[in-house]
Amino acid sequence: MAGEIPDLVAEPRAGTGKGAARQARRDGYVPGVVYGGGADPQPIQIKFNELLRRLKAGRFMATLFNLKVEGQEDVRVICRNVQRDVVKDLPTHLDLMRLRRTSKVNLFIPVEFINEGAAPGIKKGGVLTAVRPEVELRVTAGDIPESITVDLTGLDIGDTVTISSVTLPEGATPTIDRDFVIANIQAPSGLRSADNEADEEETEEATAEEV
């Protein structure tokens, strides 16, 4: 997410606790709190429709925002949690953490696969299995990547893609200190079944010869 930081407009929220939060929801807002950055927690509220629009747009939890609250200095924040109604799945509360543009933060970044048509394994009918459709990376708050790209060119059935084989965005590092698998190309189910049957026949023949 390099480039201009989008604004997130909020209002100060009077009072804390369940009663104040319920009142905010009745008034058409989603209550929240801003914390971190060496300052006291600040109760806020965001218009329900505006928050819902941003959530539907995607990547809300992976976007650095410029929080604007009337009468206060702008502050950069990232959302760390959105609570939802268990029945309606609508937002009921959110937590925002203060950050500087140079701050480091751990985020799950989606994986994008390209050049499937240039993968011999897929041409043969192999199946691309995304073991990790998202990868947790430590990134700079002011330069959060949209995704990490995995190039499938040249991959055959049985090949795997590990984190060490992927070119990560500048400044991004994995949070897991091992060479974990992101994806692999598996044989088609029909071929796997045929291979299993062949293995069983070979085992039976070997057993018969021993007898």
From Swiss-Prot:
Region Disordered: start-end pairs = 1-23, 191-211
What keywords appear on the UniProt entry? Ribonucleoprotein, Ribosomal protein, RNA-binding, rRNA-binding
Q: Among the record's GO biological process terms, what is one?
A: translation
Q: Which GO terms describe its molecular function?
A: 5S rRNA binding; structural constituent of ribosome
Q: Where is the composition biased (Acidic residues)?
A: 196-211
The keyword Cell inner membrane is assigned to this record: no
* InterPro entries noted in UniProt: Rbsml_bL25/Gln-tRNA_synth_N (IPR020056), Ribosomal_bL25/Gln-tRNA_synth (IPR011035), Ribosomal_bL25_b-dom (IPR020057), Ribosomal_bL25_C (IPR037121), Ribosomal_bL25_long (IPR001021), Ribosomal_L25_dom (IPR029751), Ribosomal_uL5_bac-type (IPR020930)
Which cellular component appears as one GO term in the record? cytosolic large ribosomal subunit
Outline the subunit composition: Part of the 50S ribosomal subunit; part of the 5S rRNA/L5/L18/L25 subcomplex. Contacts the 5S rRNA. Binds to the 5S rRNA independently of L5 and L18.
Role played: This is one of the proteins that binds to the 5S RNA in the ribosome where it forms part of the central protuberance.
The record's similarity note reads:
Belongs to the bacterial ribosomal protein bL25 family. CTC subfamily.
This chain's protein is named Large ribosomal subunit protein bL25
> What is the phylogenetic placement of the source species in the record?
Bacteria, Pseudomonadati, Pseudomonadota, Alphaproteobacteria, Rhodobacterales
